[in-house]
């Protein structure tokens, strides 16, 4: 039996479902939402983002708030390998793993010399199996961006979605899922597990799981 991690998709979006404006502005989270994000990070074994999130936000993906400051493994998924080794995620602890379908890139050896683990992948399900078998990842948090979230949802490789609705309207920009979309009845159904008004009083945090018939 193929074993894979339990996958939690976490995101904060505007009322109209955007992760960022068309210019890349993405400051949506209140301090309480940021703390919630870091607490979830501390409870998982790995946190994953796409390459564009690394290029635009330059995140460290470490745990800064909460009682448990244990940092998860950081995972970056890229097809092009258009990444700079000076980004925070590659120059600070803990370990970072890059999964790429462009393993022949001349940059691979440069990243390996800096201590970054680089793995070749063609399909997300193979990537998840590798994380489970070789990195002991049992719980994985996927933080974006929109293309990566779409791949997970399209391939039905998620277990839970935790989403915070921020009181902003962007009108255009990066959607929660950036992909070709579903057609009618093939779109997945979700079951609402929990709904909370944020401590700030102006945001709502929702937890969904896949609807089980």
Curated annotation (Swiss-Prot):
Pathway this chain belongs to: Cofactor biosynthesis; riboflavin biosynthesis
Sites where the protein binds NADP(+): 53, 57, 79-82, 122, 145-148
Pfam families documented for this protein: RibD_C
Catalytic activity as recorded in UniProt: 2,5-diamino-6-(1-D-ribitylamino)pyrimidin-4(3H)-one 5'-phosphate + NADP(+) = 2,5-diamino-6-(1-D-ribosylamino)pyrimidin-4(3H)-one 5'-phosphate + NADPH + H(+); 2,5-diamino-6-(1-D-ribitylamino)pyrimidin-4(3H)-one 5'-phosphate + NAD(+) = 2,5-diamino-6-(1-D-ribosylamino)pyrimidin-4(3H)-one 5'-phosphate + NADH + H(+)
EC number: 1.1.1.302
InterPro entries (alphabetical): DHFR-like_dom_sf (IPR024072), Rib_reduct_arc (IPR006401), RibD_C (IPR011549), RibDG_C (IPR002734), Riboflavin_Biosynth_HTPR (IPR050765)
GO biological process, one term: riboflavin biosynthetic process
GO molecular function, a single term: NADP binding
Similarity field: Belongs to the HTP reductase family.
Entry protein name: 2,5-diamino-6-ribosylamino-4(3H)-pyrimidinone 5'-phosphate reductase
Lineage, broadest ranks: Archaea, Thermoproteota, Thermoprotei, Sulfolobales, Sulfolobaceae
């Amino acid at each position: 039996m193929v074993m894979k991690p339990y996958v939690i998709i976490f995101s904060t979006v505007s009322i109209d479902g955007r992760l960022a404006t068309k210019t890349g502005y993405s400051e949506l989270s209140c301090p309480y939402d940021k703390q919630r994000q870091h607490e979830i990070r501390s409870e998982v074994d790995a946190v994953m983002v796409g390459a564009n999130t690394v290029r635009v936000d330059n995140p460290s993906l470490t745990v800064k708030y909460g009682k448990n400051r244990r940092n998860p493994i950081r995972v970056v998924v890229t097809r092009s390998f258009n990444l700079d080794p000076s980004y925070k995620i590659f120059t600070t602890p803990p370990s970072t793993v890059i999964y790429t379908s462009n393993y022949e890139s001349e940059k691979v050896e440069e990243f390996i010399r800096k201590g970054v683990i680089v793995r070749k992948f063609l399909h997300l399900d193979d990537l998840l199996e590798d994380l489970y078998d070789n990195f002991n990842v049992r719980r994985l948090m996927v933080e974006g961006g929109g293309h990566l979230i779409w791949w997970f949802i399209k391939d039905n490789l998620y277990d839970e979605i935790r989403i915070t609705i921020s009181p902003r309207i962007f009108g255009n920009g990066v959607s929660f899922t950036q992909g070709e979309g579903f057609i009618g009845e093939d779109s997945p159904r979700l079951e609402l597990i929990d709904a909370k008004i944020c401590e700030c009083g102006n945001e709502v945090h929702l937890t969904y799981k896949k609807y089980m018939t």
